[in-house]
Amino acid sequence: MSVILSACGKKEAKIEYGKVDCDFCKMKLMDNKFGVLMISDKGRNFHFDDINCFKRFQEENNISSKEIHISCTDKPGELVPIETAYFIHSDNIKTPMASGIAAYSSEEIANKTAKELQSNILKWVDIK
């Protein structure tokens, strides 16, 4: 008799840059400083290459999310819950789909960058 054990731990949220396409604009996600991962209530992963694609997808589709994670400019490729990120909007920020919005995991770095760009820090509730 053999026994099979499986781990029941939560999988780490991650985006496979260069391998997945944006579920809104259909372009391949390439820049690991930007990207959104939405996990639906049914467990399906939706990928977006820019926060604007994510916002427009939400406006056009009635899909409930269980989790939403965003890649941070100060830690490329690392995803954080979108509610904990700090955002800066500036025409000087070059993003995949020209939203000009970048997420940061650190309030200190976001403050420094906002000052350099003469911008303000926003939270997710301010831009969603």
Specify the residue positions occupied by each region the protein language model found.
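Short metal-coordination and nucleic-acid-contact micro-motifs, chiefly zinc-binding Cys/His arrays
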Residues: G18
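C-terminal motif of bacterial Sec signal peptides marking the signal peptidase cleavage site
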Residues: I4-A7
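Post-signal-peptide N-terminal segment of Sec-exported extracytoplasmic proteins
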Residues: D23-I63
